[in-house]
Amino acid sequence: MCIRDRRCTPDVGVVLLTGNGPSPKNGGWAFCTGGDQRIRGKSGYQYAQITETGAPAGDDASTVDTARAKAEGGRLHILEVQRLIRTMPKVVICLVNGWAAGGGHSLHVVCDLTLASRECARFKQTDADVGSFDAGFGSAYLAKQVGQKRAREIFFLGRSYTAEEMYRICLLYTSQSPR
């Protein structure tokens, strides 16, 4: 895992998390849109089999990488990823260049700082939309940062927020125009 490696690398002082893009489908950008609902099995998100090109082998829970699932304990461990971020002895900055939705929204919440594109960044907690819940630190940290009532609004209503709105409710350090 990259985060675990960077933790122990002495010449790394800051960890930057950002998304990939632009999308070959529509040219859009995303920071992280959370778990792929197509591969969510009865016991949660599973490790999908990966092809030689690095793409998932299929579109549903039937393509679980059983060897990796056995080695990793069966499910994706987002709590472990969030724990590594929160206990990182280096600053972890989240650079949101598109959608931060669901687990991606929780990921930005647990980072030390979030910088976002004023034009492209969008934030949304999707738990209510997909019948899921935050399996990590996201909801607790969110409530600590913005208060219980505002956190419940974000989690329960599932509305989307711009970078400017997130800045106003103190979830962003700053919003920037892209270069």
Language-model segment annotations:
Residues 159-164:
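Acidic, divalent-metal-coordinating active-site segment for phosphoryl/phosphodiester hydrolysis
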Residues 81-87, 95, 101-155, 169:
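CoA-thioester-processing core
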